[in-house]
Structure formats: structure tokens, C-alpha cells
Amino acid sequence: MIARHYTDVKLEEATEAEGVSLRVVIGEKEQAPNFVMRVFDVEPGASSPRHTHDWEHEVFILSGEGRVFGGGKEVALSPGYTVFVPSMEEHQFTNTGDEVLRFVCLIPLSGQC
């Protein structure tokens, strides 16, 4: 078993989005065979690029306010919201608040970037 605080994992800048950083809190290094758990921080005014990929996402909003684009619509986000993004669906997360938008994102191990 591995138990630790998420801040014990190094915060890394996202490669294709300014103002977006993440921690891979559970993944290949921990010998997780199926899934990767990541914690994202999106700075105020920042967003991920609109993009698609072959794997799904499961997201849980921890703090902050924002919106998610997906399936041709936008939805406002706040703590406690959950989001399912199917594979190959264009999507984007944007921070619309004045504090960090923080969320947990689960993906299959095969989707780890």
C-alpha cells in the first residue's frame, strides 16, 4: 500500500498549457496496473487547450470555479462537481475564478502522457 499527501508529489508544468500544472499522484511509478490519478491546478484565467484523445477522463472538482467544454456545450464547475469525458470527445477546462481551479483526473494507464 502507498499512502501519502498529494503535495508530497512534485508539481510539474503541463507541456501544452500555460498556467496549468499537475501531479501524478498514483501511476506507473507506484506500480498501478490500470489507472493513473492526477491532480491538476489551473491558474485564474488559464485553460487547457481544446483537444481529443483515445481515452476517457473521470474528473472530481476539489476547489475553485471554472467551466468545462465538451460534447458541444459548456458547464459551470465548482467544488463537488464530477465530469465524465468520453474518449475522442473534444474538451477543455478553464478557470473562471480568482483562485486555483484544482481537480482530480483519472485516466487509464494506457493514456498516460
Functional labels for PLM-detected ranges:
Residues 73-87:
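Short acidic-glycine-tyrosine-enriched beta hairpin
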